[in-house]
Amino acid sequence: MQAARIDRYIKKQEGLDSLTREDIERIQLEKLNRLLGAQRLRNGFYKDLPGGLGSLGELKELPFTTGRDVAENAAGMLMTSQADIRKIITEHTSGTTGRAKRVFYSEGDCEDTIGLFMAGLGEMTGAGGRVMICMPFSGPGSLGELIAEAIRRIGGSPIRAGAGLSY
């Protein structure tokens, strides 16, 4: 049986020959601890979190980030330099009042997302495939554009039919 594309993607990203549940949990904990350590030094929104965890089970002890946190502290949540930001998504509240939420994405974030989409979409289509994308196309780095790029990279043809486009 051939491994799922997402498994092959993770193995390639992590330089592994095989992938077990234990490998995944070890990778998750290592990456989380690296992130926690770096954010503690940045003195931003996450500065009061612990510098690392002993197990993934300790995640439940961390405070949950709320929509209000995102709306009020977007710049303090940056995990990279502002110069590295490629895409900013602004999400307005469902009501008529309240601050918009802003989420920032670096070039690396967008490339990682495309790679993940390639792994997932590659299970359903490939070279010569045609895929209709009914997602927002709000400019470079938008969800629709990232999906379209993933389809192009696996040799398919994206059919753009999302918000902001006519059918």
Regions found by a protein language model. Give the residues of each.
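Short helix-loop-beta connector
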Residues: 125-129
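Nucleotide 5′-phosphate-binding alpha/beta core
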Residues: 1-92, 98-112, 119
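Short, charged low-complexity intrinsically disordered segments located at boundaries
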Residues: 62-71, 123, 141-150
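AMP-binding/adenylate-forming
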Residues: 107-120, 130-167
